[in-house]
Amino acid sequence: MAEIINQIPGYEKGRVQRINATDEVSESFIVAQMAADLRKKWNTSVLCISLDGHKEAIESLIPQEKAVGTVYVLDQKNPEFEVVLRKAEGIINRRFVRALIISGAERLTTRTFKEKPEKGREWIDHRLNGLSGGIGLPIILVEVHEESIEVQS
């Protein structure tokens, strides 16, 4: 799993990046490791938002070592994207948060954009680019992509 973290293209400020996980366990692990890594490298706080109810799993995987920043984990089950965005902006503005990691973002688009998932991804990227570009915040979306099996007839 550590190899996955090392392969992530740098944490670029002001940019939305997508990372694919193989299952929900690896998704939580990636979020926790990235949050701990960012907290240690930048000496700052990180906000993690779990859109699929994995708050406890993420919190248990974050190393409890002494660091300057704090990792905040927000749990949002079956949320509306606008509500999540508003809550994230509130926390970012009140605390010294300089990175945002969202797990389960693809679940938001599958409900709204069932027929056109690519359009949903573009919509989310557009909304998050506005948040990240204004204050130079890196936003990382961790998503689960199961391998689709094609049935030949």
Please provide the spans of the model-predicted regions.
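The Walker A/P-loop phosphate-binding site
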Residues: 1-66, 86
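Conserved ATPase "switch" residues in P-loop NTPase domains
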Residues: 11, 39-40, 92, 131-133
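Short amphipathic alpha-helical segments and helix-helix/interface helices
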Residues: 35-36, 88-89, 125-129
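Conserved inter-motif catalytic segment of the P-loop NTP-binding fold
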Residues: 42-123
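C-terminal regions of RecA-like/P-loop NTPase motor modules
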Residues: 1-2, 94-97, 148-153
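Structural motif
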Residues: 18, 99-103, 140
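Structured loop/turn residues at beta-strand edges in well-structured enzyme cores
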Residues: 14, 95, 135
